[in-house]
Regions:
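Anionic-ligand binding region
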Residues: 139-189
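Active-site neighborhood of phospho(di)ester-bond hydrolases with catalytic His/Asp-centered motifs
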Residues: 15-16, 40-45, 66-71, 123, ...
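Active-site environment of divalent metal-dependent phosphoester hydrolases
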Residues: 19-24, 48-50, 74-77, 128-130, ...
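N-terminal active-site segment of His-dependent metallophosphoesterases
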Residues: 1-65
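Active-site neighborhood of divalent metal-dependent phosphoester bond hydrolases
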Residues: 56-57, 62-150
């Protein structure tokens, strides 16, 4: 990543929901380099579901970017009750706990819930009780985060579906890939998922925010999805997690 000097315009690469998918993470980071991203931000859920949690944590730490806690990160270190997880998510959380090194657990335990930058904020799930990992899936959910937002812009993840809400009257939303954010309308942008997309597009997904021109682009990256799915099966994780990865749902 290019790095920035004081007062310079910045291209941010904002990504999350990696879910132990190292192949997808590598593809996203390579695309960020290609797209001249200056600074990366990770919205959490580095682990869970996928077969390479340790490698994903190592890579995120190596980048040295701002990183937030996701619910699966907390589940993997015993900071979140997994009884309400579905069966496959529970199995993956238990498997992930055993796969982590002590330094991985320490890192995941050190992550915060919200980060405020000069003209935007980032969170894993919702600004409405960020430590509860609530979802922003509906206009009602979005309204709660707008109430808590004191910046023009929020980036979030958690649902694995790129969806943008605009604080217009009435509220509007879009799934467009090109999002204008510089006109003063407060905006919530879901950046999609690197490692387990759920909008029926299996490509790795993240956002590029160019603060100089006031634009966000939801960016998709091809990678070897089948290889990542085979790693899930080889690790002894539920086969359903591999199948859904290839289907993007």
């Amino acid at each position: 990543l290019a790095g920035i000097g004081p007062g310079e315009a910045v291209r941010y690469g904002i990504f999350g929901d990696i879910h132990g998918n190292f192949d997808a993470l590598e593809a996203v980071l390579a695309e960020m380099d290609k797209q001249n991203v200056d600074e990366a931000l990770c919205l959490g859920d580095i682990v869970g579901y996928g077969a390479e949690p340790h490698r994903c944590i190592q890579k995120v730490r190596e980048i040295g970017c701002i990183c937030l806690a996701g619910n699966h990160d907390h589940a993997a270190i015993g900071k979140l009750d997994i009884d309400f997880f579905n069966l496959y998510a529970r199995e993956a959380a238990v498997w992930t706990r055993a796969a982590l090194e002590p330094e991985d657990r320490e890192f995941l335990g050190s992550l915060g819930f919200v980060e405020h930058l000069p003209n935007f904020a980032v969170v894993h799930g919702s600004l409405h009780g960020p430590e509860m990992f609530n979802y922003i899936s509906t206009i009602f959910d979005a309204d709660l985060s707008f109430d808590a937002l004191d910046k023009p812009l929020l980036f979030y993840g958690h649902t694995h579906i790129p969806l943008t809400f605009f604080d217009t009257k009435p509220m509007t939303y879009t799934m467009d890939a090109e999002i204008p954010v510089g006109d003063g309308t407060r905006t919530l942008v879901n950046v999609g998922s690197v490692g387990q997309p759920r909008d029926e597009d299996p490509r790795a997904c993240f956002a590029i925010y160019d603060d100089a021109i006031g634009s966000v682009k939801i960016t998709r990256v091809e990678y070897d999805v089948h290889q990542a799915a085979q790693k899930i099966i080889a690790a002894g994780l539920p086969e359903a997690l591999a199948i859904r990865l290839e289907m993007g749902k």
